[in-house]
């Protein structure tokens, strides 16, 4: 446990162990992308391998279930893939938390800063009832935590309650966990 929050590595589950192996064996590393000095961890090979993808989805679904998810929030873009699969496995609905400009109006918008710029997330302002619902946010990577913190604010603005964050991997040294506050963070593979 890290600061009272589950890092994912405390779990002795078979699902978590399989997912860690899958991530270790299939993650591709790209130096100096998207900017000089950044090591990008590309999960494309993990997602493209059926067994590796299933292992990660199973571990994330287990964590989301433990967090009492009533609906899954998948972050643009790889969070859509993982979040949809987790929601399907758990028999839950999924909401796509989109980057700015991808949804028709009216929308609810939340601005935030990245480690290499700024951006915004959006949800539809109509047709989505999150009032009082327990939302677990799912994405591929925890870096600075800016995107996830913005997603939490967006969900809360729409009336939902974020009960946890579930990530495949974490990039160390960027303060991501600290930025997320006291909500549980489940990470399959901690920083390398």
UniProtKB/Swiss-Prot annotation:
It is found in: Cytoplasm. Its EC number is 2.4.2.7. GO terms for molecular function: adenine binding; adenine phosphoribosyltransferase activity; AMP binding. InterPro entries: Ade_phspho_trans, PRibTrfase_dom, PRTase-like, UPRTase/APRTase. CDD domains: PRTases_typeI (cd06223). Keywords: Cytoplasm, Glycosyltransferase, Purine salvage, Transferase. It holds the Pfam family Pribosyltran. The keyword Glycosyltransferase applies. Homodimer. Belongs to the purine/pyrimidine phosphoribosyltransferase family. Catalyzes a salvage reaction resulting in the formation of AMP, that is energically less costly than de novo synthesis. This is Adenine phosphoribosyltransferase.
